[in-house]
Amino acid sequence: MNRIYRLIFILCAFCGIAQAQPERPKLVVGIVIDQMRWDYLYRYYARYGEGGFKRMLGEGFSVENCQIPYIPSVTAIGHSCVWTGSVPSIHGIAGNAFVKDGKIVNCVGDNTVKPVGSDGKAGYMSPRNLWVTTIGDELRLATNNRSKVVGVALKDRAAILPAGHHANGAYWFDDKAGRFITSTFYMDKLPEWVNKFNKRKLAEKYLSQKWETLYPIDTYQQSTADANNYENGIVDGEKAQLPLDLAALYKKHGYKIIRNTPFGCNLTFDIAKAAIEGENLGKNTDTDLLTISCSSTDYIGHQVGVNAVETEDCYLRLDQALADFFAYLDKTIGKGNYLTFLTADHGAVNNAAFLQDQRIPAGIWNGKSMVKELNQELKAKFNTDKDLVMTIMNYQVFFNTATIEEAGLDYAAVKQVVVNRLKKEKIVHYAFDMEKTSTE
């Protein structure tokens, strides 16, 4: 009898646990902030409002010690890892661009598809190079396609790779057309809600104003003075010093300038809201998924660095945009009915010249120069006039294998010469032949 009572107690206990499980969210929103360093959460914390980053820190859970087991950490790889839970050797995305079948390819480039919503080259994109499924793919499969999955971003790869193969749609910004587009991989024509959104011409509205600091510029104490020698310009050839006349820059550079302003993030959240309404996300019996990537933080970071006034101002404005978006979700989906997470695809380091001026050891790796040096050494060593090294990408050396084979050279010997040469470089920590990793 005691055994029976114990069994009943255990079964009842498990029943209680099952009944206590919370309901599944109606909508999951995953937000990736391109190039956001972890310390930005706290570096600008005192200036954030209560509804954005602070709300996430206060109401959510923060992973304070997250490490990545792969190299390099760039946009395409980072987004793929976040949304597939795998690494480059498994998901197949080895960089923003990489060598495939002896040719350098765009991570999402696909000439077998055609643009939808544009006639430009920006639409020849798909997730075909992604070898595995995303969270959204698995969600669609698990619910027999009842769940909806949509991805939005300015960058094509930041919309496509998170959304995956089986998404209802992925939409990215075409600089030439000034609107969000997709490809025939997903559909043959844009949904009406996307057409309506594009007709609003929000990019033009954002670019009709000036980009001024959100607060008095002398209060930006976390940044280097705005006029400095560590920046490339807001776009190459255009000085990065606020305020910026965006209307003049738009007239000169076209729609692409939106990427290099904080308002690119606002535009991204605008289409995210349109997607929620247009696809009725969060209104179904099964959980839906929306992937969002804020790309402007990366463009700005590359142009002016991590210590710039423009970068600080971008994150202060992003905080406001997040607060507005969360308030929108509270109203449309209902507080407690959605689950959101925020992460980054990769971080960034200070400008090397800036670090050197602070007496901190730093330098820059010149891959193109190294390719020339390696080819010169190989030509002399193997008595050939052909370039044996194709390129250096993503910390990897790629060879012209057909040329090596035609010349009758020992491929292993060629690689060893390169390994030995790279080991002499002070900036190179370790060099090895990938085919020998199990023995070295």
Where are the model-predicted features located?
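Short, structured active-site-proximal loop/turn typified by the sulfatase FGly-forming signature C/S-X-P-X-R
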Residues: L41-I90, K148-V152
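Loop/turn elements at helix/coil->beta-strand transitions in domains of secreted/extracellular proteins
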Residues: R24-V29, E59-V63, I90, N144-V149, ...
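Stable alpha-helical elements in mature extracytoplasmic
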Residues: V32, R37, G49-F53, G78-H79, ...
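Beta-strand elements within well-structured catalytic alpha/beta cores of enzymes
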Residues: K26-R37, M56, V82, L139, ...
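Second-shell loop/turn segments in exported
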Residues: R37-R43, I68, K121-P127, Y255-P262, ...
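Secreted, luminal/periplasmic, and some membrane-associated catalytic domains
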Residues: Y48, E64-N65, V74, N96-Y124, ...
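Bacterial Sec-dependent N-terminal signal peptides
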Residues: M1-R24
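His/Asp/Glu-rich, glycine-adjacent segments
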Residues: V87, G95-D286, S295-H302, V417-M434
